Every structure is written in structure tokens, then in C-alpha cells.
Amino acid sequence: MKTVVFAYHDMGCLGIEALLAAGYEISAIFTHTDNPGEKAFYGSVARLAAERGIPVYAPDNVNHPLWVERIAQLSPEVIFSFYYRHLICDEILQLAPRGAFNLHGSLLPKYRGRAPLNWVLVNGETETGVTLHRMVKRADAGAIVAQLRVAIAPDDIAITLHHKLCHAARQLLEQTLPAIKHGNILEIAQRENEATCFGRRTPDDSFLEWHKPASVLHNMVRAVADPWPGAFSYVGNQKFTVWSSRVHPHASKAQPGSVISVAPLLIACGDGALEIVTGQTGDGITMQGSQLAQTLGLVQGSRLNSQPACAARRRTRVLILGVNGFIGNHLTERLLREDHYEVYGLDIGSDAISRFLNHPHFHFVEGDISIHSEWIEYHVKKCDVVLPLVAIATPIEYTRNPLRVFELDFEENLRIIRYCVKYRKRIIFPSTSEVYGMCSDKYFDEDHSNLIVGPVNKPRWIYSVSKQLIDRVIWAYGEKEGLQFTLFRPFNWMGPRLDNLNAARIGSSRAITQLILNLVEGSPIKLIDGGKQKRCFTDIRDGIEALYRIIENAGNRCDGEIINIGNPENEASIEELGEMLLASFEKHPLRHYFPPFAGFRVVESSSYYGKGYQDVEHRKPSIRNARRCLDWEPKIDMQETIDETLDFFLRTVDLTDKPS
């Protein structure tokens, strides 16, 4: 059977050997050039291919159309990937009529993504394994063909576990490759609700945070021990590496990072103590702990730190454009609750953020993004994370001011995105549930649902299309220029400070604010086209917690992801929303200050929004990506959100001229 192989590392070598032993004909092998900054302790796929007389290639981008065409000319019946480090495009996967299969170093669906060998040790797992699975467009998500479990011993380190996984992989392939060849395999779909995903690790990720428990730090040492770069710490400005360690249940009142003793070299942790068994200074030699202590000049009571003493101990700088808006002001509140963020904000007003103006870690400038371009560029360069939250996002404006929607939502934001590319800054961009348009899927999925909009003569879609286009531009910058990004799509977030009643008076507000204004003024609640359109309403606190976790980006799991943030359990029609709001209004303690309820009135969308409007019947999110990347679930019931939103707006009304 003819195959094309994508391979690297020891797993790549053993995978090739297993294919040849099983009688496969390998037409070509694709691999990588070695990274000079990486310690090459593993076998060379290129050398093995040359020794076996198999054509071998190492293109920078195997997914380029020219390479896709060359692979197509090889007419592979089946494709295999063994630790190839780049995603293989769907066009290549579809070339093999018998399918494509990947060897992954974990028990899928657990530990999808990068560096599973290291992550299982970091997380203190007692079991892992190897999985052969069918390749699909999404990484590590295809049906499982075979798995073998591997026990992780307490004394395993990265290299010993690597050898165990290689041994298991040989066994797995010996058992499974003949079955694939003869078309005799049983595939089991992965359970998405059990999936976890982890990002790539870099040497800088392995610093020892002494406030953590000793067991956690010991697991870090195990996970990156030689030949990996090693866990590290500092004495003053001098860096040293810890190659091996032991956990001591030492009860000490010493501050975390303090040296308890030098022989053995024992360091106080957040819980217990860590013995440094072996280590080395800088580019020196490996030595046992007490000698390392002597070399570093450590004595009892000395303090270690996770970064150089001279390093700037600064907070993560977050730039929020549109900081006075609904999301911006709530996000600012959440960030300032922590002690490691500095927030820089720009907006044309400050009423919603007045409570932060005297906060020492909040810096605000009043201005317009279309005018303050120099200020914005300077702060993009200065900050670590950029959130451009400025947009026109009220439906009536889509038909009333379509060109202004395009200019602000696309053109102004594109300039900010290009600043992020220029200065290599992380951007977290607010897409919208509107991009799904008239999609007919039961659940709108970030990776699979089609984005369907109406004809050009319906200007209502200019917001959706502007947002979709900028999503695609960001994605392209990520693919081609290495832009670090996350796109998030809010689904009908509600809560205090959503719009204001003055905006509702001119029709430029979200649905619930407009309904509250009707109740406050004693005017009929207008149900556009009967109010049967269904939406999934999400409490702002749930939404902000998800957004905060995107900013935190644990394990880089959010990089390059599109994440719906909504509550599929809080689905209701606009009519049902109005009824729930009315019930809450009638029992509110301030109810007697307001006029009698004037009833519901059905109106046509064209008379309310103007010519060129189309509505969407339903909009329910899949939150699979949010669960996978953020470990997040929405928790707050819709009635609680309605009650709190109504209460907030009623208490903003001047009651001095109202009858008591």
C-alpha cells in the first residue's frame, strides 16, 4: 500500500520502521530541519530516509499549493503522521482514499495539542499513553483507531517517560498497521466533553514559582529535566537550573523561596519544601545540591526568586479601546480585582468607569479612536494585550448608518490590528454572534458552521460582514505573520450598564434596554415581527469571566482560537424576554413610581428598523471551544440577570418628579 509520511523525532523514526516492517511502500517522507536552539537527543528522520533510499523533503510550508500538487502526484492510498510539528491541511488529508492517521502521545481526548509528554508530568498525572487516530481538519480530534496505556511512575522524568511512550508506540503500530492495510479497523469517536487541550511550551515557561506547593515544583522539574531545558530559578541576578529534586513534607514558617538548609539544599515552598538534588549554574557543569549552594553563595535564610532581581516587576499591561462601554467597564473591574494587571483605556466618555478613575493601576484618556491614532499606536507598542472593543453594535444603526458602521467596525479596527502585527502584540478581538447570520445549524459552531448572510440590498448585514471580514484578516495575519490572537463571539450579553435609557429613546440600544424604557415611560412594548426570534442571553458576569480567562491564556490554549461565549441554556424569544421583564417589573419595590403597563404591540421590522432589515430566527452557541480552552461554563440563570439589569436601570431614573 502506497503511503506518504510526515514525521519527526524518535516517534517519526520508529513509525517509519514500523511501516516498512508492515509492508507499506513509502513514496516520500516530509520532515523538519533541526532547530539549532534545540538539543537534538532524538533520531534523525532525514538520515533514516536517506539510508532507506526514500525521497525526503523539509519544506517551510507543506500546505503550499505547489506541495499539495506534488503530493497529489504521488497518489498515496493512505497518509501517516508521526510527531510532525505542523498542521496538515485538509486538501492533503483528502488525497488519500484510505484516510490519514496520526500518532499522538497521550490518551486522547485528554491532552490534545502540543507537548503532551511534558504537560502530563507538569500536572502530576499517573497515567498517559499513545493514540493512533484518524486525522481530520481539527487537530487531534479524529476518531480513535487504537490506544495503549502507559503508567507514569513517581520517579519518571521526561526522558524516561519518552522511552516508555516510544516502546508503547512500537507495540501499538505493530498491532494496528496490518489492520489498517487490510481495512479491518474499528474506530471510536472521541468524547468531546472529556477533551482537554494544551499549548506549546517554551524554556521560559519552566521557572520555579516558590509560592506553589513543593509537589507542583517537583513535577515541573521532572517535566523538563535533561535533555529538555530544565526548571530554573534565580539568586539575585544569577540564573541556575534544577535538574533533579525531591519533595520534603517540611513544616516551616520560612517565606517561600527561602533556603532552609544548604546540606541538603532545601528550599521553602508554599506547602512543604523542595530539595534540590542536582543542578547547575548558567553554562556550568551539573553538581549535587550542597555544592550548588556553595557555588551560588547560599546560606540558611538566603532568598531565591523566579526572575532576576533586576528584572522589571511590572504588571501585565492591557489596552482597552472602548473602555467605557458595556464590556470594557466590566472587564476593567475584573482585571483591577487582581494584583497583576495595569489597565490603559480610551473612550469618548467616562460615566461608566468613573469608579476607577482614581485607581492607581487604571490610566484613562478621553478621546476618539479615529482621531487619537498616535496615542493608540504608542500604547499598542507599550502594552502586552490589546482589546479593541469600539464598534457600532446596535441593529437600527446597520440600516440607518451603514457606511459609518463599516468605517468604524472595519477600517478603524484594521489599523489597530496592523499595529499589533507591527509590534508583535497579542490581540483579543470581539467578533460577534452576528457573523453566523442566517445559519441553520442547531448550534452555531466556530469551526464548522457556515456564515450565511442576505443579499447586498439588505444593508442590515453590513455589520455582520464587516466583522466577518476582519475575523478573516486577523486569522490570515496569524497564519502568515505569526500574530498572536484570540477571537471571541459574545452571544447577547446582558447586565447593568448595558447601553442607557437615553440611547434607547433614539432607538440605538439593545433589546432589553429598549423594553425597560417602554416600561419606564408607560409606552407599549414593541415586538418586532411578533417577537418570536429566539436568542440565548448571557449574564455579563459569566461573559467577563470567560473573557478574563482568555486574557490569562493558561497554557497558551487560547492562541489562534475562535471562542463563542454564550449560554445555550438561557434561550428565549424576545416576546418571552418581554414577559419575564414585565413580571420582574411588576414586583419591583420602585414599581409604584412608574405608569401602568401599556401592553405589547406587534410591529413590522421595516417600520422600526427601516428598509433593508432582515432578522434571524434563532442563534444558539456551541460552547465546546470555551469548555476546552477556558474550562468555563455559564452559571447564571436568565431570570437573575433580568432582575439585576432592571433594578440597575430603574435606579438610574430621576424619581423626583414621579408620583409616590
Swiss-Prot record:
Its EC number is 2.1.2.13, 1.1.1.305. NAD(+) binds at D347, D368, I369. Residues 1-304 are annotated as: Formyltransferase ArnAFT. (6R)-10-formyltetrahydrofolate binds at H86, L87, I88, R114, V136, K137, R138, A139, D140. Keywords: Antibiotic resistance, Lipid A biosynthesis, Lipid biosynthesis, Lipid metabolism, Lipopolysaccharide biosynthesis, Multifunctional enzyme, NAD, Oxidoreductase, Transferase. It catalyses: UDP-alpha-D-glucuronate + NAD(+) = UDP-beta-L-threo-pentopyranos-4-ulose + CO2 + NADH; UDP-4-amino-4-deoxy-beta-L-arabinose + (6R)-10-formyltetrahydrofolate = UDP-4-deoxy-4-formamido-beta-L-arabinose + (6S)-5,6,7,8-tetrahydrofolate + H(+). Transmembrane segments: none annotated. One of its GO terms (cellular component) is membrane. UDP-alpha-D-glucuronate binds at residues 393, 398, 432-433, 460, 492, 526-535, 613. The record marks N102 as: Transition state stabilizer. It comes from the Bacteria. The keyword Lipid metabolism applies. Pathway: Nucleotide-sugar biosynthesis; UDP-4-deoxy-4-formamido-beta-L-arabinose biosynthesis; UDP-4-deoxy-4-formamido-beta-L-arabinose from UDP-alpha-D-glucuronate: step 1/3; Nucleotide-sugar biosynthesis; UDP-4-deoxy-4-formamido-beta-L-arabinose biosynthesis; UDP-4-deoxy-4-formamido-beta-L-arabinose from UDP-alpha-D-glucuronate: step 3/3; Bacterial outer membrane biogenesis; lipopolysaccharide biosynthesis. The keyword S-adenosyl-L-methionine does not apply. Residues 314-660 are annotated as: Dehydrogenase ArnADH. The active site is at H104 (proton donor), E434 (proton acceptor), R619 (proton donor). One of its GO terms (biological process) is lipopolysaccharide biosynthetic process. SUPFAM superfamilies: FMT C-terminal domain-like, Formyltransferase, NAD(P)-binding Rossmann-fold domains. InterPro entries: Arna-like_SDR_e (IPR045869), Bifun_polymyxin_resist_ArnA (IPR021168), Epimerase_deHydtase (IPR001509), Formyl_trans_C (IPR005793), Formyl_transf_N (IPR002376), Formyl_transf_N_sf (IPR036477), Formyl_transferase-like_C_sf (IPR011034), Lipid_A_modif_metabolic_enz (IPR050177). Homohexamer, formed by a dimer of trimers. Bifunctional enzyme that catalyzes the oxidative decarboxylation of UDP-glucuronic acid (UDP-GlcUA) to UDP-4-keto-arabinose (UDP-Ara4O) and the addition of a formyl group to UDP-4-amino-4-deoxy-L-arabinose (UDP-L-Ara4N) to form UDP-L-4-formamido-arabinose (UDP-L-Ara4FN). The modified arabinose is attached to lipid A and is required for resistance to polymyxin and cationic antimicrobial peptides. This is Bifunctional polymyxin resistance protein ArnA. The gene is arnA.
